[in-house]
């Protein structure tokens, strides 16, 4: 394995130049660098891929809330066991945007051009991730079919300040025996461009939460990967003045073929135990509903019954009943939900229709 990795690393270091650009501004942020820069393999069976290097997300002064770049990943992922993404946000002397901002990382589907959210996080108040040696960690193995070869990534932060946030992102690609050699992923729903571009909660809306999914006939395992975070302080409050959807604890349900099958508990995560505990004077310690400032937003995995293989079944994402009385703004749930199909034979992506 060591010889294989040395050969692969040498090939990647000979790759050309990539660029990072801001996509919300006419003034691009350009960064010339090697596609794979300064490989750091923590173990013999791990390859480290450097991607964004001190790129800034900001607003105003010709700056952009997002940055894009093209990077070279290993072409063959059949022996990749796991892929971990690490997001470092440095904020020396509290010089960054001091608020807890919604942020995420995307990979572009090379065929369709659609951006897939591979990880979401909420920035800490006032500080960066310096207390975590490698920053925030997110398992992105489910997207390994897209994290191969020349790969486009995007990082976004819902900041409204010119001082913004600065990021470096790298990936540990761990080789070994995967559970299945092949996998494919496709979004079921993505209402996640920002905290307030999510699904309105407690009022009528036109966003589709019902879909039909068809799994390939050679699927050996399939599951849903869902990321959810709520925003807003809408009333009526729950006990303890918990407004929706940032603070109100709720249970969401996924119905498969019209039967309530999976539940997502949006409750306390223990925000006060966050190792990034230097966020004062920010209000970081109280528990939100399913997320915390300065942490990655959890991904929720729901394994589908094997009897669904090769068939078309219905999917519906359902909220707990509650009505916004309109006296304190709106409530939103930013949601992305993907279906992943795995097999030991080459597999195509599941098909999702309305």
Swiss-Prot record:
Q: What are its E.C. numbers? A: 3.5.1.52
**What does UniProt report about how this protein is used?**
Widely used for the removal of N-glycans from glycoproteinss and glycopeptides in laboratory.
The leader peptide range reads 1-40
User: What GO terms are given for molecular function?
Assistant: oxidoreductase activity, acting on paired donors, with incorporation or reduction of molecular oxygen, reduced ascorbate as one donor, and incorporation of one atom of oxygen; peptide-N4-(N-acetyl-beta-glucosaminyl)asparagine amidase activity
Q: Which UniProt keywords apply?
A: Disulfide bond, Hydrolase, Signal
User: Where in the chain are disulfide-linked cysteines found?
Assistant: 91-96, 244-248, 271-292
The reactions it catalyses are:
Hydrolysis of an N(4)-(acetyl-beta-D-glucosaminyl)asparagine residue in which the glucosamine residue may be further glycosylated, to yield a (substituted) N-acetyl-beta-D-glucosaminylamine and a peptide containing an aspartate residue
Enzyme class at the top of the EC tree? hydrolase
For whether the record's keyword set contains Repeat, the answer is no
> Altering residue 100 to N: what's the impact?
Complete loss of activity
The answer to whether keyword Zinc-finger applies is no
Short name of one Pfam family for this protein? N-glycanase_C
Please list the residues that make up the active site.
Answer: 100, 158, 246
Role played: Cleaves an entire glycan from a glycoprotein. Requires that the glycosylated asparagine moiety (reaction 1) be substituted on its amino (R1) and carboxyl (R2) terminus with a polypeptide chain.
Subunit details for this protein? Monomer.
Q: What else is known?
A: PNGase F binds primarily to the polypeptide chain around the glycosamine junction including the inner di-N-acetylchitobiose core on the carbohydrate moiety.
Protein name according to UniProt: Peptide-N(4)-(N-acetyl-beta-D-glucosaminyl)asparagine amidase F
Its organism's taxonomic lineage begins at:
Bacteria, Pseudomonadati, Bacteroidota, Flavobacteriia, Flavobacteriales
């Amino acid at each position: 394995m060591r010889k294989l990795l040395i050969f692969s690393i040498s090939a990647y270091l000979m790759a050309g130049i990539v660029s990072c650009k801001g996509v919300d501004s006419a003034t691009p942020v350009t960064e010339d660098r090697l596609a794979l820069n300064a490989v750091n393999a923590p173990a013999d069976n791990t390859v480290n891929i450097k991607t964004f290097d001190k790129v800034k997300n900001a607003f105003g002064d010709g700056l952009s809330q997002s940055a894009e770049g093209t990077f070279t990943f290993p072409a063959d992922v059949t022996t990749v066991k796991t892929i971990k993404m690490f997001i470092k946000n440095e904020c020396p002397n509290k010089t960054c945007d001091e608020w807890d901002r919604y942020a995420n990382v995307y990979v572009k589907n090379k065929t369709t051009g659609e951006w897939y959210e591979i990880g979401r996080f909420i920035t800490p108040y006032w500080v960066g991730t310096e207390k975590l040696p490698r920053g925030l960690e997110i398992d992105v193995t489910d997207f390994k079919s897209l994290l191969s070869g020349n790969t486009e990534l995007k990082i976004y932060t819902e900041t409204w300040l010119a001082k913004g946030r600065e990021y470096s992102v790298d990936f540990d690609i761990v080789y070994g025996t995967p559970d299945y050699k092949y996998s494919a992923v496709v979004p079921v729903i993505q209402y996640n461009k920002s905290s307030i571009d999510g699904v309105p909660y407690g009022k009528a809306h036109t966003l589709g939460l019902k879909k039909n999914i068809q799994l390939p006939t050679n699927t050996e395992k399939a599951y849903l990967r869902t990321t959810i975070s709520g925003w807003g302080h809408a009333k009526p409050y729950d006990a303890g003045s918990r407004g929706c959807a940032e603070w109100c604890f709720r249970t969401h349900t996924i119905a498969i073929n019209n039967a309530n099958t999976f539940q997502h508990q949006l409750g306390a995560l223990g925000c006060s135990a966050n190792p990034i505990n230097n966020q004062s004077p920010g209000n970081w310690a109280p528990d939100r509903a399913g997320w915390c400032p300065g942490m990655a937003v959890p991904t929720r995995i729901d394994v589908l019954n094997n009897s669904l293989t090769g068939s078309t079944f219905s999917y519906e994402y359902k909220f707990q009943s509650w009505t916004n009385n309109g006296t304190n703004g709106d409530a939103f749930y930013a949601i992305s939900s993907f279906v992943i199909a795995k097999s030991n034979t080459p597999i195509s992506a599941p098909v999702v229709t309305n």
